[in-house]
C-alpha cells in the first residue's frame, strides 16, 4: 500500500513537563517527557520518560537518572 493511502494512527498526546531540555532533531511520538529531563539530539521518543532522567537513542532509552541522595547522575545499565 502506498504511504499516501495508509491510515494515520494517533498514538496519544505529547506532554513536555517543566524544565525539559530537548536536543536538535528529536521526534516525540505520543509520549510524556518528565520534569527536568534531557532528551539527546537525534532521539526518537516513543515511551514516557520519567522525571530527572537523560534519554538517548532510536528508540530513546533512559541512560541516566538523577540520585538525590548522592546529588549526582547515575548511569542506568
Please place each PLM-identified region on the residue numbering.
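Flexible, glycine/small-residue-enriched loop-and-beta-strand segment within the central core
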Residues: 1-33, 58, 66-67, 73
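Short-chain dehydrogenase/reductase
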Residues: 21, 38, 54-56
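Beta-rich strand-turn-strand
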Residues: 25-38, 43-47
